[in-house]
UniProtKB/Swiss-Prot annotation:
Keywords carried by this UniProt record: 4Fe-4S, Iron, Iron-sulfur, Metal-binding, S-adenosyl-L-methionine
Protein name: UPF0313 protein MA_4618
Domain Radical SAM core: 438-707
Residue numbers spanned by region UPF0313: 129-742
Segments for region (Unknown): 1-128
Organism: Methanosarcina acetivorans (strain ATCC 35395 / DSM 2834 / JCM 12185 / C2A)
Pfam families tied to this protein: DUF3362, Radical_SAM, Radical_SAM_N
Keyword flag 4Fe-4S: yes
Length: 742
């Protein structure tokens, strides 16, 4: 499974120059700009505000005291590459401003509000969550309302906060509705009708993962809700919220985003219902999906709606998913059936250009009935998630056709710096009377980079953030750290520095700029690729400078360390042991059976043993007593009872017994979930064993906790079933003692 071959010929990454199929510039329409054109309409998403307080700038409104110039060196995000390979024109001829407001679907003119809000209350540092907060800012209406399944925490570890601040920075008036009631639309009406659109997210995690255990039982805690309370978001939050919004405001555009919408953008296996569900845009009454890290996409959408475009015509933004009518799709396919490419180009140039840029995968009807077709569809779209060479994907559904545009490019270093230095308060909204546990975990942490080239089969980060690493500059991270030290509750400890993985900061590959991450091989599996720059030099410099900041006593890594990478740089490993571990280092070998680690695309136990030896040696050298805490997994595709017994024996022999154990949970768009549903490796076509029986899954988990008296019966039954009763008795090698069954 390590080598993932590509079966289709890729086109080059050269932008299409045919003006007929690129987004037309509106230079000739300068005299027809909308009344409320925003700051940041030049070339970038984030343009430093230079209007003076109290004077009207490009917003057409008073700047309301927020006109401080940004510090030098904070670059904006360029929009120049947004549509350079666009295939379908948003509309023929010049775009006309929608009569009833940007993006709306009615022809009626909106009535102007006669009453203007005014208040002597100071404007909150937070984005508004109530009509009173909107009023305190002197606003008549909001441009965009973000709806989320999480509590509102204004911290850069929370997706809603990032999107809200990015839109605010681009000049839009943004409000947030967090964890609304979903039995009726009233909560969704409290901030009124947004002028542009609603954006809907389930929160930082898929709502099914937030609400349910791997055994599909309700969770007892929800770290993203005040006081760990459960029941504050529905299952399938994105669909439910969208339906309630449509009831309240039938003609307001809805844009979906976040992890739940992103990873359900195609027909997908749904663990709760144990069946294949339609793409989320086929189930939710929404207009677009923003997939992946959505800063570039969401601001481009906002600007184009602001300019008067109909959201139904916005079809060329990378990193978005849109719907096509079944009839239109059939007509497009018919036009593209020319006897050869030249004929098709002459008779139906639009269709020919479309099929040059998009690939059709098996339809919902096919993948829901044929597991081999599901695996084929998965393999195709998995290999097209490269922002440099990836093509768009088309998947027909019974009542609509889902079209995913090619992925959006990653942010540059300067852009990422800018995003993470926006004016987050770093706190939960003051309306909450109980703490948000998820904030407590990251409050004094620093995000250094995005992306992960680890390639673990069960992880969706690659599909959401991409394999290519984008790192913040050292100076940007230091500026944020300095602000942390100024907080009154800072105790001198920075408890996390990293990203999806702690030690990929500053790493890269010489091929990424031209072709993106390789499609025919993984970066770390079955071994670290020699073309990868695995130097930890930049990370070491950052950690050293963080330690030297006044007021900082300790800087801990906090995030998971990729130990196969750490072995590539002994200087990093020594520094890690000397300065950056608080007593325990958490790593994730996940399993010790080769068959299972191969299915997971994880390094095997020999690599783990090398790391353990080095870790012990460096701890001895620096005179510290520190320990490894292993994260392990049961029930992963490819894992049998024999594999779990092998794991238990390894833990017995190496003293690695741990409580940090999780059952495999199938979540959309991961390789492991594809294997779980189909029983096939999507890259080789080989069959994969999958434990789906609840009893066997319980036995697998029990074997990792074989010492627990509560698991005796399950462990005994597993050993008996596997023919390993030699491990029952009083001998040293035995996992459990022989006794009469209770």
């Amino acid at each position: 499974m390590g080598v993932r071959k590509q079966t289709m010929v890729k086109d080059t990454a050269v932008p299409i120059e045919n003006k007929k199929f690129t987004r037309e510039k509106k230079d000739k329409e300068k005299d027809k700009k909308p009344d409320r054109e925003r700051a940041g309409r030049k070339t970038g998403f984030f343009v430093p505000k230079k209007v003076e307080t109290g004077k009207k700038g490009k917003l057409g409104r008073k700047s309301e005291g927020k006109a401080e110039e940004k510090a030098e060196g904070k670059a904006g995000i360029s929009t120049s590459t947004i549509s350079e390979r666009a295939v379908l024109k948003p509309s023929a001829g010049k775009r006309k401003k929608a009569e009833s407001g940007p993006g709306t679907k009615t022809g009626k003119k909106e009535k102007k509000q006669k009453k203007s809000f005014s208040s002597s209350l100071p404007a909150s540092k937070f984005l508004p969550m109530s009509p009173e907060e909107v009023k305190a800012r002197g606003w008549k209406e909001l441009d965009i309302i973000l709806v989320t399944g999480d509590a509102y925490v204004d911290h850069s570890s929370f997706g809603t906060a990032i999107i809200g601040r990015v839109l605010e920075d681009a000049g839009f008036r943004v409000g947030i509705i967090a964890q609304p009631r979903w039995d009726n639309p009233e909560d969704l009406k409290k901030l009124g009708r947004p002028r542009l659109f609603f954006s809907v997210s389930a929160g930082n995690t898929d709502s099914m993962v937030s609400n349910l255990t791997p055994g599909l039982k309700p969770r007892k805690k929800d770290a993203y809700s005040p006081g760990n309370k459960t029941g504050l978001r529905p299952n399938r939050s994105v669909i439910i919220y969208s339906n309630r919004i449509k009831e309240a405001f039938p003609n307001v555009p809805i844009v979906l985003g976040g992890i739940e919408a992103s990873l359900r953008r195609f027909a997908h296996y749904d663990y709760l219902s144990d069946k294949v569900r339609q793409a989320i845009l086929a189930d939710a009454p929404a207009d677009l999906v923003v997939y992946g890290m959505g800063e570039l996409q969401i601001v481009e959408i906002a600007k184009r709606l602001q300019a008067g475009e109909d959201i139904r015509k916005i079809r060329d933004i990378p990193g978005t998913v849109w719907k096509m009518e079944v009839r239109a799709w059939k007509e497009l396919k018919e036009k593209g059936k020319g006897t050869n490419e030249a004929v098709a180009r002459d008779t139906a140039p639009e269709a020919a250009e479309f099929f040059k840029e998009y690939i059709e995968i098996p339809s919902f009807s096919e993948v829901s009935q044929d597991k081999a077709a599901f695996a084929k569809a998965f393999r195709t779209y998995f290999l097209e998630q490269n922002p440099i060479t990836g093509k768009g994907i088309v998947q027909p559904h019974p009542k609509t056709v889902i079209v995913q545009n090619r992925p959006m490019r990653p942010l540059t270093e300067a852009e990422l710096d800018h995003v993470y230095e926006l004016p987050y308060t770093g706190e939960a909204h003051p309306s909450y009377t109980e703490p948000i546990p998820a904030l407590e975990m990251v409050k004094f942490s620093l995000t250094t980079h995005r992306g992960c080239f680890g390639g673990c089969s069960f992880c969706a980060i690659t599909q959401h953030q991409g394999r290519m690493i984008t790192s913040r500059s050292i100076e940007s991270v230091l500026r944020e750290a300095k602000k942390l030290t100024e907080k009154p509750d800072f105790k001198g400890i920075i408890n996390g520095v990293g990203g999806p993985t702690a030690n990929m900061y500053g790493m890269g590959c010489r091929s990424w700029e031209k072709q993106g991450a390789c499609l025919d091989k993984a970066c770390l599996y079955p071994r670290v690729c020699p073309a990868l720059d695995t130097s930890h030099k930049k990370l070491l410099e950052l950690m050293k400078r963080l330690r030297e900041l006044p007021g900082v006593k300790h800087v801990f890594t906090g995030y998971g360390v990729r130990y196969d990478l750490a072995l590539e740089d002994e200087e990093y490993l020594e520094e890690l042991c000397t300065h950056h571990i608080s007593g325990q280092l958490r790593i994730a070998p996940e399993h010790f059976s080769k068959r299972v680690t191969d299915a997971m695309s994880k390094p095997g136990k020999k690599v783990y043993e090398r790391f353990s030896e080095k870790f012990a040696a460096f701890n001895k050298k620096c005179g510290k007593e520190q320990y490894i805490v292993n994260y392990l997994m049961s029930g992963h595709p490819g894992c049998t009872l024999k594999d779990m017994i092998e794991m238990a024996e390894y833990l017995r022999d190496h003293g690695g017994y741990t409580e940090q154990v999780q059952d495999f949970t199938p979540t959309p768009m991961t390789v492991s979930t594809c294997m779980y549903y189909t029983g096939l490796d999507p890259f080789t076509g080989k069959k994969v064993y999958v434990a789906k029986d609840k009893k066997e899954k319980a036995m697998q988990r029990a074997l990792m906790h074989y010492r627990s008296p509560a698991n005796y019966e399950l462990v005994y039954e597993a050993l008996e079933k596997a023919g390993r009763l030699d491990l029952v008795g009083n001998a040293h090698k035995c996992l459990i003692r022989r006794k009469e069954k209770q």
